């Protein structure tokens, strides 16, 4: 399992190499919740998914490939950008975790 650093800003895009794949996540505010777009190796997997705490971001095993992401929060709070890097973090885990 690996923590992915996030900035405490409302909208951001990040690219990381994990599990032999190139991932691109776009995290953005959608009114009072956070949404996410996910690409793996420049292929769009998901767009506009609502981010919920302590659950895999990619809900389908066949799309997740060699790993998956999740937002870990205190007290099952909905992930919110102002708490990134404090009590809300993004993690990735691979097949061996």
Where are the regions that the model predicts?
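Cysteine-centric segments in proteins
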Residues: 7, 22-24, 61-97
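Short, charged/polar N-terminal "headpieces" of proteins
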Residues: 1-24
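Generic "edge-of-domain/loop-turn" microfeature
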Residues: 11, 23, 32-34, 43-45, ...
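Acidic, aromatic-enriched beta-alpha/helix-loop junctions
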Residues: 31-73
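Generic recognition of long tandem-repeat/solenoid scaffolds
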Residues: 15, 36, 90-91
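Compositionally biased, intrinsically disordered low-complexity segments enriched in polar/Pro/Gly
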Residues: 1, 39, 43, 76, ...
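Solvent-exposed, flexible loop/coil residues
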Residues: 8-10, 27, 55-56, 75
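A generic beta-sheet turn/junction motif
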Residues: 18, 29-31
């Amino acid at each position: 399992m690996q923590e992915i650093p996030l900035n405490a800003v409302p909208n951001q895009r990040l690219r990381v190499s994990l599990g032999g794949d190139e991932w691109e996540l776009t995290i953005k505010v959608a009114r009072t919740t956070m949404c996410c777009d996910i690409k793996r190796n420049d292929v769009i997997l998901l767009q506009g998914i609502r981010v919920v705490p302590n659950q895999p971001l990619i809900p389908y095993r066949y799309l997740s490939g060699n790993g998956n992401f999740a937002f870990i929060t205190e007290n099952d709070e909905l992930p919110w950008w102002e708490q990134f890097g404090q009590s809300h973090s993004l993690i990735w885990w691979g097949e061996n975790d």
